[in-house]
């Protein structure tokens, strides 16, 4: 019994082990099915055929479990699916799930494309542009990747990283930095002049199981599922620092690295500073770059040095976390970690650690140098790849030109997208360009080889028709080119075989710079951007060339055989000579800049591609009729940015207007589409016309809403297309300022006007329309002309297709008819069309994804002559559509009401980060670094979860650990539950940030408020010395300091007394008076004190007394001088009078004679005599006396005067009269003055 127990236990253990193994095998077998799509084994294990099958299955099961674990963690950031509302139907729920899935796939594809190929985050406009293209089905995920891989920015990034490899001192190529070689076969029977373009190439990051197994095996052009290795960090990290050495004086010898002083100081500095870096992981070495003199003072030396770290050595602790987030598109806070993991994780504490270590070594006496820890600055951190060996590729076909694998990178990428089917039509672009974006550090051999490969033409024996797109750009980059508005491309004969294009970098410049023909000289032909998505022109679309003698100018790099074929077969199509002659003067000089934006090289396509399995449909060359007016207005900014965003779809057809229709078949189909419960009508039109179009057309129709028209050719079986989603936007979306869901119906009433005859151009362009692939075009609001054809008896909408390749303006003339009111139906023969204006409800919940809408922007010229003409421009500007509310009544739209963008404020608190005073300064490095970190964390998360997200702005950081105040702007209005949605998203972000990024965010500190309800001052870091002011127009809040306080470098407001210690001089006390500002309280002594605004004036008591006495004395002196001067003047007058009078002996007779003379009759003084009589009468009644003496008159006594008169011959009455006059003269001063006045007049 005792022996049986151990045996039983062993048997039971074997049984359990067997059952467990069986379950593992069955689980691996069940999970083996999805592993065919994507392999999770490493390339070494997947290609190792020596491993047993059972062991590989176990490894598959283990790796699958790990991947599923990561995918389950991924759900932390995104919710699983779309929430189902109780009011939704099954169809609506399914449609919402499909929309949600499509938006998620597009979002992740866009993020991965930007991160993989351009190594950066997409901008708002870029993200919106690619989301529209992806959601509308215009481009697929793989086509998007092909476009990004062939972009100029991607190639510049590759060249930049290749240039970094030449900076490393000594290292060898590794698998992580240099990719395996890929070989591409040359088609059988092809005579190629492409010098080694398809021999071999090396490209980082590309891997294939077939190439790893057998390097000599050819790889087909079919797209295969390849397991991509995770991107490894840079081989080396180089961090550049700058620090100041105190106690040293800079000399000119330190400029020369060969001087003894320079070498001595370098050795001393490295030996001392190296101690601070030895403890860091991955440290390799340090080198001094230069010594500089300090800018502020003369003492000290600024040392610029670089420290090298091993990127692989430090990945032990950080690479695991990076790999955890490698599959998470939304975690773009680690976007730079692929190249600089050390910088990202240690940049906030790196400077403090080094400065503290250096300072401690100096204090402990271990260092002879005295570095200033405050002057330590981290200038730059960059990753350096290991150098790779260049494999020289020799041409074995027809040339001895040797090139490197990096110079033919574009050709190898281009070859990947060529179809393996030999019957597929090949698209070829002859690119006569010469612009090369190679690295400045490239060698001369590489530059020579790249310039030699500018233009490569090869002949291929393919039976399928081909298409050649002519392109040209100016000779000098940034120069100006003559742009022909009406594109007139040359067409090759269908039998001319051409091969795929070969380009070394983005763009090229033709040495001649222009392509000339016999009719159009000194003009250039705007070419379509080179892309593998360009669709071919079939054989039957090429008109017969009877007299085609025009030759294409050859380039030095074209082969002679290709030049001869092009000379024979390229010419101007027949029937376009008149058009070319008419528009020869309509040229516009515009500047050209290199294509660096996303939209530059992208071209719409109709779903054709390598391995797509579709029949090859054809897009005909677009043509447009142009007027004779000369346009010299430069293109607008929005036009220059998006001119290459769409395929030119200019209508090459003859439109029938004024009812002159010979044979017209027009079918209008309106399909109703429902978004929720809101129907939106779309119009599709198929037309086949065989007439001409008058260029000038009269129209009195007001601007209408944008429509969509589908131009197709006349085919035997007319198919009706049913749309599930508009390619660009609904007809009109009206969103009122309120959030209530309303439906507005705009009825367009046609205005009846009589057709008037105007002079039309005699030149008509005959055009034949073969089979055409449907292409969607969007028209501006004013590009719609309503007509009614009498033969058909139904309304039709004739539209002119617009193209960004031309700026010609057409004047359309049409007779307007009044339509009778009938019940609105969706039948194609309705006479009154109703455009239903549906309110787009933009949900910002986690499960909703919105759509951005665009409309064409009309300039002032396009609205000109609205009374008799409607100007239509063939330029379509796709800009952001403003949110408008349209009136419900018919007629001309009176006005539009624009709704402002929604603003949401929120704040959160990070508890495991310490606040510093530098975070108050928005210009400090610490503030910018922290701001950039939060933007990289929050922007991708919010943009992927919120529809209509526009941008995020960090307003401020406040103390309290770290409180982040932010503001989010939305492009469109949002429902009232935006606060709740934002709160949920931020709450999930807090959880995710704590689990993945070691950020402890307090959930209870989350504060979310919408802009119309929130107080902007709440999210401003205004302290107690400032007040928050809100701009009533913009709603922006700003902190304004109180009087006496000042903000320096955007720091919180501080007192002037603290900011300016010398504000008060002479020991004055600075004080802040509320409402007045800073004042100085000056010192006061016993007999002295200071005064002035800053106490700058000294005053003492003796000095004041002296000044007072001096002032009094001065006043007295001045008064005395004035009195003395007046006395002198009076004395001088008396002296003059005395001199004028006679001597005393003759004084009496003169006095009497003067009185007598005064009494003589003078006719001029009769009035005075009458006055004298009145005096005599008054004085005759009163006795006369003299105040001096009664007996003395004029110095003589009364008796003496009487004796004098008696001795004369005067009568008694005369004597008596004269005596009275004398008495009056002596007693009355007024009379005396009167007498003296007349006496002076007589003299």
Swiss-Prot record:
<dbReference type="InterPro" id="IPR039861">
    <property type="entry name" value="IMPG"/>
</dbReference>
<dbReference type="GO" id="GO:0008201">
    <property type="term" value="F:heparin binding"/>
</dbReference>
<feature type="disulfide bond">
    <location>
        <begin position="1017"/>
        <end position="1028"/>
    </location>
</feature>
<feature type="region of interest" description="Hyaluronan-binding motif involved in chondroitin sulfate A-binding">
    <location>
        <begin position="255"/>
        <end position="263"/>
    </location>
</feature>
<feature type="glycosylation site" description="N-linked (GlcNAc...) asparagine">
    <location>
        <position position="945"/>
    </location>
</feature>
<feature type="disulfide bond">
    <location>
        <begin position="1064"/>
        <end position="1080"/>
    </location>
</feature>
<keyword id="KW-0245">EGF-like domain</keyword>
<keyword id="KW-0472">Membrane</keyword>
<dbReference type="GO" id="GO:0005540">
    <property type="term" value="F:hyaluronic acid binding"/>
</dbReference>
<feature type="glycosylation site" description="O-linked (GalNAc...) threonine">
    <location>
        <position position="888"/>
    </location>
</feature>
<feature type="glycosylation site" description="N-linked (GlcNAc...) asparagine">
    <location>
        <position position="366"/>
    </location>
</feature>
<dbReference type="InterPro" id="IPR036364">
    <property type="entry name" value="SEA_dom_sf"/>
</dbReference>
<feature type="glycosylation site" description="N-linked (GlcNAc...) asparagine">
    <location>
        <position position="316"/>
    </location>
</feature>
<dbReference type="InterPro" id="IPR000082">
    <property type="entry name" value="SEA_dom"/>
</dbReference>
<protein>
    <recommendedName>
        <fullName>Interphotoreceptor matrix proteoglycan 2</fullName>
    </recommendedName>
</protein>
<dbReference type="InterPro" id="IPR000742">
    <property type="entry name" value="EGF-like_dom"/>
</dbReference>
<feature type="glycosylation site" description="O-linked (GalNAc...) threonine">
    <location>
        <position position="817"/>
    </location>
</feature>
<keyword id="KW-0677">Repeat</keyword>
<feature type="glycosylation site" description="O-linked (GalNAc...) threonine">
    <location>
        <position position="429"/>
    </location>
</feature>
<dbReference type="GO" id="GO:0008104">
    <property type="term" value="P:protein localization"/>
</dbReference>
<feature type="region of interest" description="Disordered">
    <location>
        <begin position="205"/>
        <end position="234"/>
    </location>
</feature>
<feature type="domain" description="SEA 1">
    <location>
        <begin position="235"/>
        <end position="349"/>
    </location>
</feature>
<keyword id="KW-0358">Heparin-binding</keyword>
<dbReference type="GO" id="GO:0005576">
    <property type="term" value="C:extracellular region"/>
</dbReference>
<feature type="region of interest" description="Hyaluronan-binding motif involved in chondroitin sulfate A- and C-binding">
    <location>
        <begin position="1128"/>
        <end position="1136"/>
    </location>
</feature>
<feature type="glycosylation site" description="O-linked (GalNAc...) threonine">
    <location>
        <position position="704"/>
    </location>
</feature>
<feature type="glycosylation site" description="N-linked (GlcNAc...) asparagine">
    <location>
        <position position="225"/>
    </location>
</feature>
<feature type="signal peptide">
    <location>
        <begin position="1"/>
        <end position="27"/>
    </location>
</feature>
<dbReference type="GO" id="GO:0007601">
    <property type="term" value="P:visual perception"/>
</dbReference>
<feature type="topological domain" description="Extracellular">
    <location>
        <begin position="28"/>
        <end position="1106"/>
    </location>
</feature>
<feature type="glycosylation site" description="O-linked (GalNAc...) threonine">
    <location>
        <position position="428"/>
    </location>
</feature>
<feature type="domain" description="SEA 2">
    <location>
        <begin position="900"/>
        <end position="1013"/>
    </location>
</feature>
<feature type="region of interest" description="Hyaluronan-binding motif involved in chondroitin sulfate C-binding">
    <location>
        <begin position="1083"/>
        <end position="1091"/>
    </location>
</feature>
<feature type="glycosylation site" description="O-linked (GalNAc...) threonine">
    <location>
        <position position="701"/>
    </location>
</feature>
<feature type="domain" description="EGF-like 1">
    <location>
        <begin position="1013"/>
        <end position="1054"/>
    </location>
</feature>
<dbReference type="GO" id="GO:0060042">
    <property type="term" value="P:retina morphogenesis in camera-type eye"/>
</dbReference>
<dbReference type="GO" id="GO:0043235">
    <property type="term" value="C:receptor complex"/>
</dbReference>
<feature type="glycosylation site" description="O-linked (GalNAc...) threonine">
    <location>
        <position position="712"/>
    </location>
</feature>
<feature type="glycosylation site" description="N-linked (GlcNAc...) asparagine">
    <location>
        <position position="959"/>
    </location>
</feature>
<keyword id="KW-0732">Signal</keyword>
<feature type="region of interest" description="Hyaluronan-binding motif involved in chondroitin sulfate A- and C-binding motif">
    <location>
        <begin position="1212"/>
        <end position="1220"/>
    </location>
</feature>
<feature type="glycosylation site" description="N-linked (GlcNAc...) asparagine">
    <location>
        <position position="582"/>
    </location>
</feature>
């Amino acid at each position: 019994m005792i022996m049986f127990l151990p045996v039983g236990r062993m048997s039971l253990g074997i049984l359990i082990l067997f059952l467990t193994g069986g379950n593992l095998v069955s689980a691996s077998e069940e999970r083996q099915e999805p592993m065919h799509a994507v392999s999770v084994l490493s390339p070494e294990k997947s290609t190792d055929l020596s491993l047993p099958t059972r062991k590989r299955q176990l490894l598959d099961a283990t790796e699958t479990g790990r991947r599923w674990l990561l995918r389950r963690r991924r759900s932390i950031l995104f919710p699983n699916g779309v929430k189902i509302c109780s009011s939704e139907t099954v169809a609506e729920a399914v449609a919402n799930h499909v929309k949600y899935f499509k938006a998620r796939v597009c979002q992740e594809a866009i993020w991965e494309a930007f991160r993989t190929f351009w190594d950066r985050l997409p901008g708002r406009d870029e993200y919106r542009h690619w989301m529209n293209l992806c959601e509308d089905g215009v481009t697929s995920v793989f086509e998007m990747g092909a476009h990004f891989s062939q972009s100029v920015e991607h190639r510049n990034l590759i060249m930049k990283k290749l240039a970094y490899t030449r900076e490393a001192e000594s290292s060898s190529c590794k698998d992580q930095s240099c990719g395996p070689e890929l070989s591409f076969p040359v088609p059988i029977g092809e005579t190629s002049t492409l010098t080694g373009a398809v021999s071999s190439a090396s490209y980082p990051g590309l891997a294939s199981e077939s190439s790893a197994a057998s390097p000599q095996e050819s790889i087909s052009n079919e797209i295969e599922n390849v397991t991509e290795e995770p991107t490894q960090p840079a081989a080396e990290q180089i961090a550049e620092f700058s620090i100041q050495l105190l106690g040293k004086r800079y000399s000119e010898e330190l400029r020369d690295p060969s001087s003894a002083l320079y070498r001595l100081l370098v050795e001393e500095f490295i030996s001392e500073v190296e101690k601070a870096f030895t403890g860091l992981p991955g440290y390799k070495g340090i080198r001094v770059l230069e010594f500089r003199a300090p800018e502020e003072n003369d003492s000290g030396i600024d040392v610029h040095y670089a420290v090298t770290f091993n990127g692989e050595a430090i990945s032990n602790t950080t690479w695991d976390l990076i790999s955890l987030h490698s599959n998470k598109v939304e975690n773009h806070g680690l976007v730079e970690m692929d190249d600089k993991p050390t910088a990202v994780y240690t940049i906030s504490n790196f400077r403090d650690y080094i400065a503290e270590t250096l300072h401690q070594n100096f204090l402990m006496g271990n260092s002879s140098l005295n570095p200033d820890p405050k002057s330590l600055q981290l200038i730059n951190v960059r990753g350096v790849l290991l150098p790779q060996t260049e494999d020289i590729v020799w041409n074995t076909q027809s040339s001895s030109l040797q090139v490197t694998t990096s110079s033919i990178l574009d050709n190898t990428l281009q070859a990947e997208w060529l179809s393996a089917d030999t019957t597929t039509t090949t698209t070829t672009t002859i690119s006569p360009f010469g612009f090369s974006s190679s690295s400045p550090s490239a060698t001369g051999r590489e530059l020579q080889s790249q310039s030699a490969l500018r233009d490569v033409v090869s002949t291929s024996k393919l039976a399928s028709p081909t298409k050649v797109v002519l392109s040209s750009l100016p000779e000098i980059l940034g120069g100006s080119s003559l742009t022909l508005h009406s594109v007139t491309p040359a067409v090759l004969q269908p039998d001319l075989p051409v091969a795929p294009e070969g380009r070394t970098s983005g763009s090229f410049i033709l040495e001649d710079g222009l392509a000339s023909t016999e009719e159009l000289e000194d003009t250039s032909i705007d070419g379509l951007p080179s892309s593998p998505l360009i669709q071919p022109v079939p054989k039957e679309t090429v008109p017969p060339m009877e007299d085609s003698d025009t030759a294409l100018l050859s380039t030095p790099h074209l082969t002679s055989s290709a030049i001869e074929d092009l000379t024979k077969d390229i010419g101007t199509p027949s029937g376009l000579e008149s058009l070319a002659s008419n528009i020869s003067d309509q040229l516009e000089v515009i500047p050209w800049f290199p294509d660096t934006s996303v939209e530059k090289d992208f071209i719409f396509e109709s779903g054709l591609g390598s391995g797509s399995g579709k029949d090859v449909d054809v897009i005909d060359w677009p043509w447009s009729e142009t007027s004779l007016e000369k346009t010299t207005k430069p293109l607008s900014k929005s036009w220059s940015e998006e001119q290459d965003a769409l395929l030119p779809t200019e209508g090459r057809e003859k439109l029938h207007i004024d009812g002159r229709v010979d044979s017209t078949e027009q079918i209008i189909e309106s399909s109703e589409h429902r978004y929720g419960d809101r129907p939106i009508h779309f119009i599709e039109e198929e037309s086949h016309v065989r007439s001409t179009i008058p260029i000038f057309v009269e129209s009195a129709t007001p601007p209408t809403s944008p429509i969509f028209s589908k131009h197709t050719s006349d085919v035997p079986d007319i198919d009706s297309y049913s749309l599930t989603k508009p390619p660009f936007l609904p007809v009109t979306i009206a969103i009122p300022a309120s959030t209530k869901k309303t439906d507005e119906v705009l009825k367009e009433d046609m205005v009846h006007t009589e057709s008037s005859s105007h002079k039309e151009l005699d030149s008509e362009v005959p055009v034949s329309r073969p089979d055409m692939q449907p292409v969607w075009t969007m028209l501006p609001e004013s590009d719609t002309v309503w007509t009614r054809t009498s033969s058909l008896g139904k309304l039709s909408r004739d539209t002119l297709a617009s193209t960004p390749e031309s700026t010609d303006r057409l004047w359309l003339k049409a007779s307007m008819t009044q339509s009778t009111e009938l019940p609105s139906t969706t039948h194609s023969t309705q006479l009154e069309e109703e455009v239903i204006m549906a309110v787009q409800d933009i949900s910002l919940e986690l499960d909703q994804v919105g759509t951005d809408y665009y409309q064409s922007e009309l300039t002032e010229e396009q609205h000109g002559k609205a009374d008799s003409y409607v100007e239509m421009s063939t330029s379509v500007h796709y800009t952001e559509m403003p949110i408008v509310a349209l009136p419900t009544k018919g007629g001309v739209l009176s006005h539009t009401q624009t709704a402002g963008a929604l603003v949401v404020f929120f704040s959160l608190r990070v508890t495991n980060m310490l606040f510093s005073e530098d975070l108050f300064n928005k210009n400090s490095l610490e503030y910018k670094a922290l701001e950039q970190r939060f933007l990289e964390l929050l922007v991708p998360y919010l943009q992927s979860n919120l529809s209509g997200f526009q941008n995020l702005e960090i307003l401020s950081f406040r103390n309290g650990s770290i409180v982040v105040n932010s503001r989010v702007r939305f492009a469109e209005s949002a429902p009232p539950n935006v606060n709740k949605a934002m709160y949920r998203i931020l709450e999930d972000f807090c959880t995710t940030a704590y689990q993945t990024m070691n950020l402890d965010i307090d959930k209870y500190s989350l504060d979310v408020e919408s802009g119309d309800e929130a107080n902007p001052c709440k999210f401003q870091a205004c302290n107690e010395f400032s007040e928050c002011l809100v701009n009533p127009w913009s709603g922006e809040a700003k902190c304004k300091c109180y009087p006496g306080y000042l903000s320096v470098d955007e720091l919180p407001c501080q007192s002037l007394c603290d900011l300016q210690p010398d504000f008060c001089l002479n020991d004055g006390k600075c004080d802040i008076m509320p409402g007045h500002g800073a004042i100085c309280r000056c010192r006061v002594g016993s007999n002295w004190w200071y005064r002035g605004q800053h106490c700058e004036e000294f005053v003492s008591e003796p000095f004041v007394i002296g000044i007072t006495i001096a002032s009094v004395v001065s006043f007295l002196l001045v008064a005395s001088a004035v009195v003395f001067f007046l006395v002198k003047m009076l004395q001088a007058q008396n002296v003059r009078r005395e001199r004028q009078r006679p001597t005393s002996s003759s004084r009496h007779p003169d006095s009497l004679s003067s009185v007598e003379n005064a009494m003589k009759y003078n006719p001029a003084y009769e009035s005075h005599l009458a006055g004298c009589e009145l005096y005599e009468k008054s004085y005759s009644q009163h006795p006369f006396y003299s105040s001096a003496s009664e007996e003395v008159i004029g110095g003589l006594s009364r008796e003496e005067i009487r004796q004098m008169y008696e001795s004369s011959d005067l009568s008694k009455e005369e004597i008596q009269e004269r005596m009275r006059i004398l008495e009056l003269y002596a007693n009355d001063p007024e009379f005396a003055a009167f007498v003296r006045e007349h006496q002076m007049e007589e003299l």
